[in-house]
């Protein structure tokens, strides 16, 4: 038994926020699953680093450059292969929990973030190309992405809705998910296999606020926001309206804590893992944070502790003239830009 097993017993899955060919082929990912990791997330920045730093791609890049393909098609060929291989490694985990864990995420192109129809078409194509039941398609939580979520859920595709910073936007996502489920049920189709995670980004909130907050609030607001978002989640998914969908096989969306590596070296390296453990959630962690948590983390149901204190901290932040919803919109735009830049960088050597 490891600390990851203890976390799983508390109802939270720990996923790895990393993917590369070396990770898959070396047996390292399989070893992480034995330790208790339950899934994998990727994004354009992760693949950009993998392609740049992993020698195992060199031969395939050279071969793909001999073919009449666009840089994006070359990228997708390699990324889909990696995700398919990771899905294979995670399949036993997926099947052992009746399809509730063991997912691997691949993101749609960042250039589609404001294009709902384009997102739907690419998500369908990527999902079919991967061809694995434990694949999740990652879609940014813009208004267009939330529209796409509804359609993809009604298609029967599992989705990782990413770049959430806003409680308001997260609630909109839950409603879109419920509409997609209702449409699928109305068509007489099964919904039990569909899983959606709402990826709520953590450390970037503190990174943006810590320069403007008084000392006693520094390093506190991201966790406070997550605790408030979890209260919202509990309220939404215990309504009679959702209970009616649940009775027909629908799963609850799960909050996934993302960006949980600590950016400020003054903070404990397991800050955003230790303090965000709760039932029906996921935490996707980079390698260094995973190692730190296994070494000296604490497995305790902390997400429902100190909720009143969290609300007070958010109220004090608002009283200082800081609107966390306005901040959320800015952080999402910044995140989209970062992924677009990483995607351009990723494609450049594939021309």
From Swiss-Prot:
Its main location: cytoplasm. One of its GO terms (biological process) is pentose-phosphate shunt. This is Transaldolase. It is an enzyme of class 2 (transferase). Pathway: Carbohydrate degradation; pentose phosphate pathway; D-glyceraldehyde 3-phosphate and beta-D-fructose 6-phosphate from D-ribose 5-phosphate and D-xylulose 5-phosphate (non-oxidative stage): step 2/3. CDD domains: Transaldolase_like. Belongs to the transaldolase family. Type 2 subfamily. One of its GO terms (cellular component) is cytoplasm. Gene3D superfamilies: Aldolase class I (3.20.20.70).
